[in-house]
From Swiss-Prot:
GO terms for molecular function: ATP binding; phosphoribosylamine-glycine ligase activity; phosphoribosylformylglycinamidine cyclo-ligase activity. This is Phosphoribosylformylglycinamidine cyclo-ligase. It comes from Methanocaldococcus jannaschii (strain ATCC 43067 / DSM 2661 / JAL-1 / JCM 10045 / NBRC 100440). GO terms for biological process: 'de novo' IMP biosynthetic process; adenine biosynthetic process; purine nucleotide biosynthetic process. Its main location: cytoplasm. InterPro entries: PurM-like_C_dom, PurM-like_C_sf, PurM-like_N, PurM-like_N_sf, PurM_cligase.
Amino acid sequence: MVTYKDAGVDISHEDKVIKALVSQITFKRSDIKPAELGLHYAGAVEFGDYYLVLSTDGVGSKMIVAEMANKFDTVGIDMIAMNVNDAICIGAEPIALVDYLAVGHITEEIAEQIGKGLNEGAKEANINIVGGETATLPDMIKGIDLAGTVLAIVKKDEIITGKDVKAGDVIVGLRSSGIHSNGLSLARKVFFDIAKLDINDKLSYGKTVAEELLTPTRIYVKPVLEMIRDKDIEVKGLAHITGGSFRKLKRLNDKVTYYIDNLPEPLPIFKEIQRLGNVPDEEMFRTFNMGIGFCVIVDEEDANKVIKIANKYNIPAQVIGRVVDSLEVNGNKIVGKAVVKYNDKHIILE
């Protein structure tokens, strides 16, 4: 049995580190006020009738897989996806991005491949890449790290924080394209350390390890913005399902409980990781998206409209759960958490 912590990633410790860092950042300009969003998906500052929204993220250890496969033409899509998918979670439209590339050494050919992916991601997200920084740091970095920061914009009266999420609302899940850009440390440990596979070896269902792990993260910008702008849909909450899985729903409203009891069958990649690594169900749902990359919370009567828009963009979607005031699990009252029903048991995501 292997866990994410065994692979070197301790989510609980990361939470503590983030809180420690944020606790020391107290300065605020008096003339340009930040939006009070707490630990949401993105940050924002007031700009007239608008909020300017900023979000930053990177590709993480997926870059190690790209180096193993010597294939870098899609990691730019991943970086942009991780940023823009976060920005839209407060209803903002991404408009521009700057990238940060840190390397020990890089060839022109690899740089071209990365640029190709960045361009494809920019096209899919409908944003401008307006600049960036390339840092050559041979004493610090052995490989390549790719990150970026996105700028987005939303009218003040149109920001979506999740405060209106209430019991009775439904959770519509939009399918992921695969592993996306989270949980790669655990996936690599399972495939390469435990199963002793090579990057080009085939998995039990025919795809190679490289094909599965380098499948680009799905970009949800266009369908989600269409949902937000549809006057017949009241979007109450939006969640990018990344590291930590459905526990991210708590960012929207931690006064209610999110009951996920109608998930589609997990994608083959997740079943393969679980089988080869003997990974417990609980650990799978704390680490991976398990086939759902984005959640939209709406009134029950709006669910089919959301699904129809997702399908228009060739994204499978379905109602995967609902919002409740509380839930009783094994005699305990659960409030302010996500609970997943899977294999006839309840998994509580703290």
